[in-house]
Amino acid sequence: MINANFLADTDPLVAEIIQKEYGRQQDHLELIASENFTSPAVMAAQGSVLTNKYAEGLPSKRYYGGCEFIDEVEQIAIDRAKQLFGAAHANVQPHAGAQANLAVFLTLLKPGDTIMGMDLSHGGHLTHGSPVNISGKWFKAHHYGVNKETEAIDYDQVLELAKKHKPKLLICGYSAYSQIINFEKFRAIADEVGAYLLADIAHIAGLVATGHHPNPVPHCDVVTTTTHKTLRGPRGGLILTRDSELGKKLDKSVFPGTQGGPLEHVIAAKAVAFGEALKPEFKTYSGQVIENAAALATQLQERKLKIVSGGTENHVMLVDLRSVSMTGKKADKLMSGVNITANKNTVPFDPESPFVTSGLRLGSPAMTSRGMKATEFIEIGDIIAERLQNPEDEGIAQKCRERVASLCKAFPLYPHMMAKVPSLV
């Protein structure tokens, strides 16, 4: 492989920025729920010579020559994905979760058809019918939300809305929802109104793969996911189905329907990540992700901060900052000031705009990857509460920074890279 000094010799400006980003990741508590730290093996595959190869088509059905080894690695990724999720068919080529969803829409829908997913402000996703996304521009989008009292999905309301709007595609799976999803109930609702059912499990895929969350594959027509987040792979997408014939149509919607050449270096990294996820250690990791999230949520509640829906059953939680008379925008800035990376987020029935919000989204996957356990997440919860409840006290801010620094030092990111190097790839 390429010597670590090569990038610094060729482009010292970019090398320096990469080094700075490594320093930022090392010195911050990463609590953005959609982020994680991949293994060095995943990064090595992604930085390999496979980036040089065009490979339009599928294994053994390529439009370019010289794909014999590309075919092998992509088939490994396909086989491992199918094994992980119990699927009959997998397409590992989508560049991202949004592209995976677009391919599903192209397969199952025509412009003007009706779709129904969760409202973005309640925890849904842009690609589930938001008016600013192609899914909301090409299709008639309707949305369901959570119950105002429980802040959890009201399946009776979903059924009522589905009967009213008669969607051709019903979507479940969310970007900021902390409770278990009942895919069996969604299947029953879809069947009652004659809809296809899509589960977008981008956030919970790693938990599903290890049995820590119910598997949607037996119940849904199609399942999409990203390959990073809780799955801890490279940034990319994945499509799964239990229907092999439908799988063939989905393949055509990926290529040539919505993409050209696949990113085979990323697919190799997906194969590595799927292999890691099949190991017992990854199941232990996923269980720890859930335990750590619960510890964080409980500590925040003990410090009198409100958690949407009363807690978390997965890796993510929303702090309703109206309990401390603060906006998400302000909280995001306060967290950044003590080297905690999180993101402002709308909460259900939020009176603030998406650019301001009343919530802060937190997640446990990344810092769990660095080896932290419940004890550390209790400490993190205490730091967060201390800062949010004393926003004007710079003395407390400094103490919070010191506590963050101590945690980061105790759980280094990529210890083999701790020495200052010009390139991390």
From Swiss-Prot:
Ordered alphabetically, the record's keywords are: Amino-acid biosynthesis, Cytoplasm, One-carbon metabolism, Pyridoxal phosphate, Transferase
Q: What is its EC number?
A: 2.1.2.1
Compartments annotated for it: namely: Cytoplasm
Q: Which Pfam families match?
A: SHMT (PF00464)
Q: Which residues bind (6S)-5,6,7,8-tetrahydrofolate?
A: 120, 124-126, 245, 353-355
Q: Name one GO biological process term.
A: glycine biosynthetic process from serine
Q: Which PROSITE patterns match?
A: SHMT (PS00096)
Cofactors required = pyridoxal 5'-phosphate
Task: Cite a GO CC annotation.
Answer: cytosol
Question: Where mainly found?
Answer: cytoplasm
> What would be an example GO MF term here?
glycine hydroxymethyltransferase activity
Query: What residues does the record give for site: Plays an important role in substrate specificity?
Result: 228
Q: Which residues form the signal peptide?
A: none
Transmembrane stretches in the record are: none
Its recorded reaction(s) are:
(6R)-5,10-methylene-5,6,7,8-tetrahydrofolate + glycine + H2O = (6S)-5,6,7,8-tetrahydrofolate + L-serine
- The kind of enzyme this is, by top-level EC class, is transferase
N6-(pyridoxal phosphate)lysine modification, residue list: 229
**What pathway annotation does it carry?**
One-carbon metabolism; tetrahydrofolate interconversion; Amino-acid biosynthesis; glycine biosynthesis; glycine from L-serine: step 1/1
Q: What does this protein do?
A: Catalyzes the reversible interconversion of serine and glycine with tetrahydrofolate (THF) serving as the one-carbon carrier. This reaction serves as the major source of one-carbon groups required for the biosynthesis of purines, thymidylate, methionine, and other important biomolecules. Also exhibits THF-independent aldolase activity toward beta-hydroxyamino acids, producing glycine and aldehydes, via a retro-aldol mechanism.
NCBIfam families recorded: PRK00011.1
Q: Which HAMAP family match?
A: SHMT
Family membership noted in the UniProt record:
Belongs to the SHMT family.
Fill in the subunit field for this protein: Homodimer.
- In Swiss-Prot or TrEMBL terms, this protein is called Serine hydroxymethyltransferase
Which organism was this protein described from? Trichodesmium erythraeum (strain IMS101)
